[in-house]
Amino acid sequence: MMHHLIQEITKEQLRTDLPDFRPGDTVRVHVKVIEGNRERIQVFEGVVIKRRGAGISETFTVRKVSYGVGVERTFPVHTPKIAKLEVVRRGKVRRAKLYYLRQLRGKAARIKEIVR
């Protein structure tokens, strides 16, 4: 009984407006950031290196290199803090978790693009 109640509550929270994306795709995440009493949109663009979980607790991690420093940020998929998510490029990869990209530098860290 309690399980069905939890499912009903989480079903209302799930987002359906996000595009389909996978590890290897380059995405642009528009995040709502609250600074003091004002809210603004911050854009974080990078490669999706992993997706994990299912349902309301599903998350994804985006990696980018900013001023020579690798930055990874993990977002819940169904959070209201994501204003918009756009897929910039579709990548062709053969792994679900792209942790090996952390060791690669420069052109070696590129991912082949595919047309899906």
From Swiss-Prot:
Keywords: Ribonucleoprotein, Ribosomal protein. One of its GO terms (biological process) is translation. One of its GO terms (cellular component) is cytosolic large ribosomal subunit. One of its GO terms (molecular function) is structural constituent of ribosome. InterPro entries: Ribosomal_bL19, Ribosomal_bL19_CS, Ribosomal_bL19_sf, Translation_prot_SH3-like_sf. Belongs to the bacterial ribosomal protein bL19 family. This is Large ribosomal subunit protein bL19. The gene is rplS.
